Structures are given as structure tokens and as C-alpha cells.
Amino acid sequence: MYSDNTRSALRRKHARLALLAGAFIAAGPAMAADNEDWTFNGGPYLWGAGIRGHVGHGSTGTQFIKSDFSDIAKTVDMSVMLMGEARRGPYSVLTDLMYIDTDTRNHLPGGAKLEVESKTASGFLGGGYTVLGDDNRRLDVAGGVRVWYSGTTLTFHGGPLGGLSGSDNATWADAMAGLRGHYAVNDRFWLSSWGMAGAGQSREDWDLAALAGWEFFPGFSAVAGYRAMGVNYRHDGFVYDIVQKGPLLGISGRF
């Protein structure tokens, strides 16, 4: 028979052992994640983005512009993207850089033309966390900040405003949040998509994409897909209210 003091000491000992075991069990996934190595994937892409929306500034007013996919060879001087992801367990760090240089011409009433030269750069930095699935099929919540730069020059040719020209530029930042998905069809084919939306210094900012990849060489995939982005920024007469969308092609490497 144990005395009351002995039984009390045993209960305390068992409680400490149970707490210690529970701590090890709870820490197991975190310790496993800590032991996982970082993996990196990403690469360059060409984006055949058509453009539609309104641009303007105080000296020229706001004007509608449009450039369809069929006009890209004539209007796009440069369009390139770089996308990357660093992943460790359920955590990921996301980057996305985009630059588009366009020169569009739109017909105005009375035979006049509007030429719009636009240089746009955008960069996203954020993070994600896997809430469902595993390495082969997963759904992540993601969030971060997207920074924009836009410089535009509007020039009127012909008509009552012929010769009028004006240039302006702006930089702004928006908070973004959304979902990202990845599905490995088999060892060589995979599908990926994301949807992000937000606002901040702009009125609205969104980004949608769907991609398919084929691993043609260990660690390297050919990627094709479709991406659409929109942003509506207006400040002190400067207007950049544009939707860009079109197919993309690229190479993604995994390290």
C-alpha cells in the first residue's frame, strides 16, 4: 500500500511524464518541418498580354485604350515575367516580377489618333501556407504586397487636339491575399493556379492564372497557361485603370 504522500508524488510524476510526452507529440510535425530542406522553383516567362482600360493625367485627360492579342506584334516592345517560389514544409515564400513596354494607337472621332506609350513594372513579395493536401496536391492560402510603377505618354495626332502631348508616372503599393493550388497529374505533368485580390493605394488589384507544366528534363518544366491582371489606380489626375490578359509560355526550374 502506498501512503497519501507517495500516491501524490506518483501522480505528479505521471502528470509530468504525460505533459512531456504530449509536448514531444505536438512538436513532432514542427521538428519534422524544421528538418526539411528548402526547395526552390521558378523561371522566366513570355506573356502575350492584351491591354484594355483607361489611362490619363492632368494635361491630357483620361482616354480609353485597347490592344488585343492579335495586335501584340505591333504594340508590345517587351513583355517578360519572372516567378519564383521557395518552399519548406507547409511554408512558402513567393516572388513575382513583371515588366511590359507597349506603344498603342487608337482611333478617335474625326480621324484623329491617340498614341499611348506605356512602361509598367510590378513586383510581388509574399508568403503562403498549405492548409490542405500534400506535395502532390495542395491548397495554400497566400498573402503579400504588390508594388506597381507606371509611366505613360499620351500624344494626339490629327484633329483639334493634334500635337497635344503629356507624360506622367506613379508608384503605388497594394496588399494582396488569396489562394494557390497545385496538382501533380503524374511524375511529369502538373497543373497550377492562383487567385489573388486586394487594394491599398489603388482602388482594386487582382491577379488570376492557370498553368500546365511538363517536366521534359529532371528538374526543368515547360510551362504554358493564361494570366489576367487588373488594377485601378487614380491619384491627382493620374489614371491607370487597366486589365491585362493573355497566354504565357516559359521555363520553370526546380532546385
Predicted features, each with a name:
Residues 1-38:
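Cleavable N-terminal export/targeting peptides
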Residues 32-101, 184, 250, 254:
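Short glycine/proline- and aromatic-enriched beta-strand/turn motifs that initiate or cap beta-hairpins
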Residues 36-38, 76-80, 119-123, 137, ...:
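Residues that define the transmembrane beta-barrel architecture of outer-membrane proteins
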Residues 42-44, 82-88, 125-129, 143-145, ...:
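Residues on the lipid-exposed face of transmembrane beta-strands in outer-membrane beta-barrel proteins
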Residues 46-50, 88-90, 97-103, 131, ...:
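Transmembrane beta-strands of outer-membrane beta-barrel pores
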Residues 54-70, 101-118, 149-169, 234-240:
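Flexible, solvent-exposed loop segments that connect beta-strands
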Residues 90-93, 134-139, 187-191, 219-222:
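Repeated loop/turn-to-beta-strand initiation elements of outer-membrane beta-barrel proteins
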Residues 222-255:
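Outer-membrane beta-barrel translocator/channel fold
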